[in-house]
């Protein structure tokens, strides 16, 4: 029986092969004879009908998106062949094969680290406001150097942002101006910023001069012309984009379910002719007037009526019915189709509004795609599959929509809300390429707080930062180092600093105590310090300035730091409770003395208050616990100008630390217990600690608030009404049931 089956299968296979060979041979002979007939007719001047002539011609089953014959008649020069397009693109960059290994000199960076030099501005050269903001962001960063011999990267002062020849911002004769720069060196180790390139009708990515071996930080760059790990794709931003700070995202709270009034929206220009018109002319097929609103208008450009079609009047009327901002804030998804160029202002607008972008721009290298995983924040569509977009986004689960929306807010606030953040992200990406052994990984770039606040020079291990304990499955540190800032001489054994030292040393969580001696008097003898169960290390400050208390000392062996002023009054129980609270919030400042900020309408400036109200926004570092990483961030991230101000005033260092931590975490600090008085009131009036009684001290702190807010570009401090007390605090139960029973008596 089995043999019969095998024979039958073999016979069937043989028959199929024979039929295939027969029909294939017939077609092959037919094609050869047809080619011979064509050759013969060509020699005799005769015309033979092609085989296609015998096939029936069916009418178009689908209506085209646009009357192509009309479009061709209006401007046939717009349509160029693929070969012409390839030739145009290939001539854009002569250094198209450039990579970091072949077109970048790493030796310049190994000498002095990653330093950026900006060419001095030339007389008579006009610079647009957007490019001035870019240069100001570089010059205000920690990477800037005014000495070209120390530079690793060079940035032109010549405005290269707008290279559209029809633009009033276009800089003429840029080729000769760049070549005349004595440090140009064929563009090696140079970075060129560009937002607009090419012009009507094809809008190629030609910047109008030979960039040589320079890197491009470019908007609307195509994947075809993008040089991986060499160029940087940046977003297209308007001239009104804030230089620093920027507005926060518009998502104030999460709605469950995360669906809004409209499923998908878009409102913009409809290009009747030319590049970018194909997709926008087809949007009306998807628009349903209910939860999918894709509105376009023909009213743009000087001669729009010349190209007006039969649908323009209806589109223009529908376009005027809806307010764009209202649509943006009430939509779940926002369509981001390409314009004349690949990039669009709609991209950043959607991110800020927490409207999940639906990208419809084939071939666009998305901004910072080298480090950002856009699949976590956007839907990547295909222009050729426009009609499938509604069904695709409707199939996305609500949990996924919520995650996408939250990620848009993180990315907006971390990398896109200001020109400064866009520039610094560009520089950090280049720095990671140069120093690959300490570069940031994808988790750092795509998780809070982002790559700008996580400095890999501090550590290459994520567990050394306070933000990734949950991701790594780690527990917060179990010990702390107490750092006591001493500014008065040790003259009595009853001084508050000695009582404080003993109280901190008795804590079960204390690993060691460091006394930072910032006093003008010599160090006291070792026998003057009380005996403790933990090591006591006395460090004499070299410069003896206020900022020295936040230096990243190697002697600090724990991740947790208990920062104390010498006149602070705390018990061991209070220290223990504050530390256990901090273990639940390791990225925040946790402590006792709370202060607040407010906006003074009469003076139009920020104010500082120590009054006890129902909320607070700062916890002073005279009695607070925080992560050691903030010492490194304070010393290496903040500009020298702010730290010099603190040192000159001998004031405001605690406010500056609160500004920094709130800017990183986007969260307020945490106050513990209801304790109000944390200072020793009997300190001598000749002591430097008596600065709190100085009438100028409070006025200085008011001034500091506004200076710090100006540098950050916004007010990072956040008000909170939360206070954490021990369980059963002041409850009418037995005192034996309470762990921190002593706190109620303090």
From Swiss-Prot:
The chain crosses the membrane at residues 8-28. Glycosyltransferase forming with EXT2 the heterodimeric heparan sulfate polymerase which catalyzes the elongation of the heparan sulfate glycan backbone. Glycan backbone extension consists in the alternating transfer of (1->4)-beta-D-GlcA and (1->4)-alpha-D-GlcNAc residues from their respective UDP-sugar donors. InterPro entries: Exostosin, Exostosin_GT47, GT64_dom, Nucleotide-diphossugar_trans. GO terms for cellular component: catalytic complex; endoplasmic reticulum membrane; Golgi apparatus; Golgi membrane; synapse. Part of the heparan sulfate polymerase, a dimeric complex composed of EXT1 and EXT2. Could also form homooligomeric complexes. Interacts with NDST1. Gene3D superfamilies: Spore Coat Polysaccharide Biosynthesis Protein SpsA, Chain A. It is a single-pass type II membrane protein. It catalyses: 3-O-{alpha-D-GlcNAc-[(1->4)-beta-D-GlcA-(1->4)-alpha-D-GlcNAc](n)-(1->4)-beta-D-GlcA-(1->3)-beta-D-Gal-(1->3)-beta-D-Gal-(1->4)-beta-D-Xyl}-L-seryl-[protein] + UDP-alpha-D-glucuronate = 3-O-{[(1->4)-beta-D-GlcA-(1->4)-alpha-D-GlcNAc](n+1)-(1->4)-beta-D-GlcA-(1->3)-beta-D-Gal-(1->3)-beta-D-Gal-(1->4)-beta-D-Xyl}-L-seryl-[protein] + UDP + H(+). One of its GO terms (molecular function) is metal ion binding. A protein binds at residues 166, 203, 300. This is Exostosin-1. Residues 29-746 are lumenal. Belongs to the glycosyltransferase 47 family. Its EC number is 2.4.1.225. Pathway: Protein modification; protein glycosylation. GO terms for biological process: antigen processing and presentation; axon guidance; basement membrane organization; blood vessel remodeling; BMP signaling pathway; bone growth; bone morphogenesis; bone resorption. The gene is Ext1. UDP binds at residues 267, 269, 271, 280, 319, 324, 346, 349. It is an enzyme of class 2 (transferase). Residues 1-7 are cytoplasmic. Glycans are attached at residues 89, 330. It comes from the Eukaryota. Disulfide bonds join 98-103, 109-152, 298-312, 334-355, 652-704. Keywords: Disulfide bond, Endoplasmic reticulum, Glycoprotein, Glycosyltransferase, Golgi apparatus, Manganese, Membrane, Metal-binding, Signal-anchor, Transferase, Transmembrane, Transmembrane helix.
């Amino acid at each position: 029986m089995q043999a019969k089956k095998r024979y039958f299968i073999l016979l069937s296979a043989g028959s199929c092969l024979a039929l295939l060979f027969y029909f294939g041979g017939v077609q092959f002979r037919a094609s050869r004879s047809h080619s011979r007939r064509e050759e013969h007719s060509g020699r005799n001047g005769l015309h033979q009908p092609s085989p296609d002539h015998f096939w029936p011609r069916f009418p178009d089953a689908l209506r085209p998106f646009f009357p192509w014959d009309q479009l061709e008649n209006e401007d046939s020069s717009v349509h160029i062949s693929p070969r012409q397009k390839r030739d145009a693109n290939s001539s854009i960059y002569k250094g198209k094969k450039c990579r970091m290994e072949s077109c970048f000199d790493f030796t310049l960076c190994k000498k002095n680290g990653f330093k950026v030099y900006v060419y001095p501005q030339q007389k008579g050269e006009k610079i647009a406001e957007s490019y001035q903001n870019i240069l100001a962001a570089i010059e205000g960063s920690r990477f800037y150097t005014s000495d070209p011999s120390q530079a690793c990267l060079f940035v032109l002062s010549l405005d290269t942002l707008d290279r559209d020849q029809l633009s009033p911002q276009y800089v003429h004769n840029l080729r000769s101006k760049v070549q005349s720069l004595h440090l140009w060196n064929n563009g090696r180790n140079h970075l060129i910023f560009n937002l607009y390139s090419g012009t009507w009708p094809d809008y190629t990515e030609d910047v109008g001069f030979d960039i040589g071996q320079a890197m491009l930080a470019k908007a609307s760059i195509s994947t075809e012309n993008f040089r991986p790990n060499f160029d940087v794709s940046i977003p297209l931003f308007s001239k009104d984009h804030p230089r620093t700070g920027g507005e926060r995202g518009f998502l104030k709270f999460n709605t469950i379910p995360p669906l809004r009034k409209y499923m998908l929206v878009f409102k913009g220009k409809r290009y009747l002719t030319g590049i970018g018109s194909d997709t926008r002319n087809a949007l009306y097929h998807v628009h349903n007037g209910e939860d999918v609103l894709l509105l376009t208008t023909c009213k743009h450009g000087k001669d729009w009526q010349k190209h007006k079609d039969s649908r323009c009047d209806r589109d223009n009327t529908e376009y005027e019915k809806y307010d764009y901002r209202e649509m943006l804030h009430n939509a779940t998804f926002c369509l981001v189709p390409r314009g004349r160029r690949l990039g669009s202002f709609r991209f950043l607008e959607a991110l800020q509004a927490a409207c999940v972008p639906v990208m419809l721009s084939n071939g666009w290298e998305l901004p910072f795609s080298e480090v950002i995983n856009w699949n976590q924040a956007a839907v990547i569509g295909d222009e050729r599959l426009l009609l499938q977009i509604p069904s695709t986004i409707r199939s996305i689960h609500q949990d996924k929509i919520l995650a996408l929306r939250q990620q848009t807010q993180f990315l907006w606030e971390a990398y896109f809300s200001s020109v400064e953040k866009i520039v610094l992200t560009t520089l950090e990406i280049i720095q990671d390429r140069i120093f690959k052994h300490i570069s940031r990984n994808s988790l750092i770039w795509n998780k809070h707080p982002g790559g700008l606040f996580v400095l890999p020079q501090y550590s290459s291990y994520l567990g050394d930062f306070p933000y990734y304990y949950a991701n790594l499955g780690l527990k917060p540190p179990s010990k702390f180092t107490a750092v006591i800032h001493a500014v008065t001489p040790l003259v009595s054994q009853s001084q508050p600093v000695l009582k404080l030292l003993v109280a901190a040393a008795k804590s079960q969580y204390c690993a060691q105590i460091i006394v930072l001696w910032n006093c003008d008097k010599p160090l006291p003898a070792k026998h003057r310090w009380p005996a403790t169960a933990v090591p006591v290390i006395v460090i004499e400050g070299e410069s003896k300035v206020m900022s020295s208390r936040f230096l990243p000392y190697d002697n600090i062996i724990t991740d947790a730091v208990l920062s104390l002023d010498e006149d602070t009054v705390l018990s061991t129980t209070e220290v223990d409770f504050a530390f256990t609270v901090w273990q639940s919030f390791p990225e925040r400042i946790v402590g006792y003395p709370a202060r607040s900020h407010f906006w003074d309408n009469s003076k139009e400036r920020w104010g500082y208050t120590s009054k006890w109200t129902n909320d607070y926004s700062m916890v002073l570092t005279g009695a607070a616990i925080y992560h050691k990483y903030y010492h490194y961030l304070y010393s290496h991230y903040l500009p020298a100008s702010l730290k010099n101000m603190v040192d000159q005033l001998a004031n405001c260092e605690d406010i500056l630390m609160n500004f920094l931590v709130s800017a990183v975490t986007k969260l307020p600090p945490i106050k513990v217990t209801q304790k109000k008085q944390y200072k020793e009131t009997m300190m001598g009036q000749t002591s430097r600690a008596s600065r709190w009684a100085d009438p100028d001290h409070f006025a200085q702190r008011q001034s500091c608030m506004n200076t710090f807010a100006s540098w950050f570009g916004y007010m990072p401090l956040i008000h909170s009404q939360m206070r954490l007390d021990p369980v059963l605090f002041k409850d009418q139960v037995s005192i034996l049931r309470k762990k921190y029973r002593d706190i109620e008596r303090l």
